[in-house]
Amino acid sequence: MNPQTDNVFYATNAFTGEALPLAFPVHTEVEVNQAATAAAKVARDFRRLNNSKRASLLRTIASELEARSDDIIARAHLETALPEVRLTGEIARTANQLRLFADVVNSGSYHQAILDTPNPTRAPLPKPDIRRQQIALGPVAVFGASNFPLAFSAAGGDTASALAAGCPVIVKGHTAHPGTSQIVAECIEQALKQEQLPQAIFTLLQGNQRALGQALVSHPEIKAVGFTGSVGGGRALFNLAHERPEPIPFYGELGAINPTFIFPSAMRAKADLADQFVASMTMGCGQFCTKPGVVFALNTPETQAFIETAQSLIRQQSPSTLLTPGIRDSYQSQVVSRGSDDGIDVTFSQAESPCVASALFVTSSENWRKHPAWEEEIFGPQSLIVVCENVADMLSLSEMLAGSLTATIHATEEDYPQVSQLIPRLEEIAGRLVFNGWPTGVEVGYAMVHGGPYPASTHSASTSVGAEAIHRWLRPVAYQALPESLLPDSLKAENPLEIARAVDGKAAHS
């Protein structure tokens, strides 16, 4: 079996490196044009579909995923080497995410309906009747992620939030798990059929050529893009989206080292802090975008004990099977390169190819300043501890950091005066601040922010996880002096949708 021809490609068994026996078409610009044109034809009706019907679609997709969970888990396990228990949890997360957005749609909050009542007698000029709501942008392109074959892929957060907003979705499946994406796409297609909605509302495109993604981002009917992946790939597509004749929003989640700051009081108070750290950095073989990639701690006996414990735990780690051969090769190359730099110490676990070893680097603040490349994310089971001379040194290093998804602080009350000096800086560089915990898990809820300043994301004012993610795919429209009968339901005076609105700047439910 040839693992690649001009017209088809095959998934790879993540454990053996061999091709799996199911061919997938290599879609081209032709299929992109067909999908985008079809999506554009249904976009207007889909964005005007009533809330209850759109919410029902999301819930039906969730049920279809759960009904085929055994098939999905079995295939994803082969393609990604992720354990079945992890994949079981990811299916639950994906289904719950869809249901969360169904609730958001039913609530009508996403309309952000605002009414300014008229005052025809106002001097010197009459005040007009102006009402505002959010509407869907149109067809959205979504790029599946390698490390979350469900929660950040074909039916993941970008797809769920875009469908909730009323945008048709075209997914470019990730080559790391095309079989998984295909089963998930079948679930969505079945849900559309059950809800008697056009199939063009969702399309999965597959292929192992960069030209597919480029054609999708460039197509004039695509009105926004959601992407989770590398800085290099994401930045290239971001540039393409902004160089189009009609530039479009590109919501990319790219790279983050997620700094952690451990104060002396926490080192003394938490005997298992090193265990927690190593568990977080190696979770999912270090292939979480929220992995704590660098730890800053003070030069104290407690920190030295923390380092020694962490090094001991690293040596005991089992070999890691990474998601793809490409990710494995990149990880090994970056780890070897960093380990050969001056002024850095590295501890490895044991591993034989095709598995990889976990790695823990340790350096001083002085050496950190000399090596700006150490701030680049290494995707895999590794992290770096930077030993600072004092709190002022730690605060100074925080000023050097680029954007991240998260920033974590470990401290007790005795260090709060110093912590209060650090927090304003962390607010500037991170989308989520974590206190006395670890950033790896990302709760799907109403308050979550999964984003941050570049290179964590390309749009720091948004989130790719949680209810607020829906607003990426919406834009405001104001309606001035329209007759009541021509207004959308969300803005009519009698409020037939019974949604929360703002009237003359004040909250109202009528």
Curated annotation (Swiss-Prot):
<dbReference type="InterPro" id="IPR016161">
    <property type="entry name" value="Ald_DH/histidinol_DH"/>
</dbReference>
<comment type="subunit">
    <text>Homodimer.</text>
</comment>
<dbReference type="InterPro" id="IPR050740">
    <property type="entry name" value="Aldehyde_DH_Superfamily"/>
</dbReference>
<comment type="similarity">
    <text>Belongs to the aldehyde dehydrogenase family.</text>
</comment>
<dbReference type="InterPro" id="IPR044151">
    <property type="entry name" value="ALDH_KGSADH"/>
</dbReference>
<feature type="binding site">
    <location>
        <begin position="229"/>
        <end position="234"/>
    </location>
    <ligand>
        <name>NADP(+)</name>
    </ligand>
</feature>
<keyword id="KW-0560">Oxidoreductase</keyword>
<dbReference type="Pfam" id="PF00171">
    <property type="entry name" value="Aldedh"/>
</dbReference>
<feature type="active site">
    <location>
        <position position="253"/>
    </location>
</feature>
<dbReference type="InterPro" id="IPR015590">
    <property type="entry name" value="Aldehyde_DH_dom"/>
</dbReference>
<keyword id="KW-0521">NADP</keyword>
<protein>
    <recommendedName>
        <fullName>NADP-dependent fatty aldehyde dehydrogenase</fullName>
        <ecNumber>1.2.1.4</ecNumber>
    </recommendedName>
</protein>
<comment type="function">
    <text>Catalyzes the oxidation of long-chain aliphatic aldehydes to acids. May be implicated in controlling luminescence as it catalyzes the oxidation of the fatty aldehyde substrate for the light-emitting reaction.</text>
</comment>
<dbReference type="InterPro" id="IPR016162">
    <property type="entry name" value="Ald_DH_N"/>
</dbReference>
<dbReference type="GO" id="GO:0033721">
    <property type="term" value="F:aldehyde dehydrogenase (NADP+) activity"/>
</dbReference>
<feature type="active site">
    <location>
        <position position="289"/>
    </location>
</feature>
<dbReference type="InterPro" id="IPR016163">
    <property type="entry name" value="Ald_DH_C"/>
</dbReference>
